[in-house]
Amino acid sequence: CFAEGGAGEDLAFETVKEHLRALVVPGKTLVQLSGGEPTVRDDLPQIVAAAKEAGCQYVQLNTNGIRLAEDEGYVRSLAEAGLSFVFMQFDGMDDGIYRALRGRDLLGVKRQAIDNCARHNLGVTLVPTLVPQVNTQDIGNIIRFAVSQSPAVRGVHFQPVSYFGRI
């Protein structure tokens, strides 16, 4: 993704529904909602429900987790709409890592997001962006944390940073 990729307008909800109806093969389609930060959309639970109604077998969310931590009602709405799984940005077990990569302390936020997802039976996969000399030394701690949070945390997907495109 490109953090400075420029602003654009989100698709209208009705347009999203049209795309889902056109593209989904009932019972065989998995949709992952991502791009920018999907949880800035108040209608995301309705989009999840529309994907399920169109026949999506699995609906996944790729998120930074901030709104999931701050708004448990939103998490409940996503779960009730049929969200299957959450892939959450999770860069390490030390706020210094978050300050270096994200500009602020976020470890407590990430933990709260996991707790809120667990309360609503949403599985979470942690997604660390690995940056040499920033958080690669924390890989073992991330794995140990993931194991300690089972069954809520169900996996870790490491993404090595790649410097290309717009910076």
Residue spans of the language-model regions?
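Canonical Radical SAM [4Fe-4S] cluster-binding loop centered on the CxxxCxxC motif
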Residues: C1-E14
